[in-house]
């Protein structure tokens, strides 16, 4: 039996890193992920008829991955991006009720959060960082209250050994409206009075951007190694790559040779 069907003219995404569908046989419902309003959001449907009961999340931001569903309390724990101020590729943990009420960010600390939870989700740890700020691990409870700082990475030795901090930036895309984000790497001997060739590290494709993950990394690919050869190295998540709105992702659908990266980066 076919309960529900969604058809799109371009890509269909069921989530960012995996499928966000869930079936709840006890209550005769299912959770559906859709980008039909241009952003990836969650919807609750009747399992028998397929009819929409209610939209759970909404707005100009996206649900990334459903991590846990509590069918007793009717709460959904999920990661999202673009709702908090700043870089839309930063990942935060949220909790929301099945009916769409009670949406709360459980990890408001700025950065990309990696979550590990107890089986009952009464407690969890979050390790968060940015491209320039090293990881901090916190222990929190189900309500998002911080119980303890578990660990803070010390990068003093990196700094003593001339580690170079990447520079996060945003510029307007090809339409002069959309903000696109990237990282810039300078050689350790950089002199603002000198000219340097620019190496644009392009990875075009609808499945991934050039950066994607803006968490802390001692060495992201060979970006800094190339910079040390005398280049200014940049990587940009251009229009046509995932992790943003559907229209952003669809920017060069069906025309990969056009490589959106070139249109946004030149």
Segments predicted by a language model, with ranges:
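Secondary-structure transition/capping motifs at alpha-helix termini
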Residues: 36-37, 45-53, 85, 174, ...
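Short glycine/proline-enriched, acidic/aromatic patches that form the donor-sugar handling elements
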Residues: 85-88, 241-243
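Multi-bladed beta-propeller domains
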Residues: 1-19, 45-72, 81-83, 96-113, ...
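C-terminal, active-site-flanking charged/polar segments
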Residues: 51, 68, 93, 222-225, ...
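Beta-strand C-termini and the immediately following turn/loop, strongest in propeller blades
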Residues: 21-37, 70, 77-87, 125-131, ...
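Short coil/loop residues immediately preceding or within conserved phosphate-binding loops
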Residues: 18, 27, 39, 88-91, ...
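Structural motif
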Residues: 39-43, 87-92, 133-138
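Serine-hydrolase catalytic core recognition
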Residues: 105-107, 112-264
């Amino acid at each position: 039996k076919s309960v529900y069907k969604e058809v799109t003219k371009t890509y269909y995404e069921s989530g960012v890193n995996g499928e966000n569908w869930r079936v709840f046989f006890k209550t005769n419902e299912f959770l559906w992920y859709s980008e039909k309003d241009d952003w990836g959001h969650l919807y609750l449907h009747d399992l028998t008829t397929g009819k929409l009961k209610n939209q759970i999340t909404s707005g100009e931001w996206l649900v990334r991955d459903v991590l846990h569903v509590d069918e007793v309390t009717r709460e959904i724990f999920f990661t999202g991006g673009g709702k908090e101020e700043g870089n839309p590729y930063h990942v935060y943990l949220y909790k929301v009720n099945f009916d769409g009420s009670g949406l709360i960010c459980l990890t408001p600390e700025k950065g990309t959060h990696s979550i590990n939870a107890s089986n009952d989700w009464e407690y969890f740890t979050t390790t968060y960082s940015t491209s320039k700020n090293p990881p901090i691990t916190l222990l929190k409870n189900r309500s998002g209250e911080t119980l303890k700082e578990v660990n803070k990475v010390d990068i003093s030795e990196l700094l003593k050994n001339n580690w170079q901090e990447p520079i996060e930036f945003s510029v307007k895309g090809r339409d002069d409206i959309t903000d696109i984000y990237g990282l810039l790497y300078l050689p350790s001997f950089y002199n603002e009075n000198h000219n340097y060739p620019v190496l644009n590290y392009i990875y075009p494709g609808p499945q991934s951007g050039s950066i994607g993950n803006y968490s802390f990394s001692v060495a992201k690919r060979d970006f800094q190694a190339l910079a040390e050869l005398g280049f200014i190295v940049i990587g940009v998540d251009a229009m046509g790559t995932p992790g943003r709105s559907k229209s952003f992702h669809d920017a060069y659908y069906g025309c990969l040779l056009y490589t959106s990266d070139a249109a946004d980066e030149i």
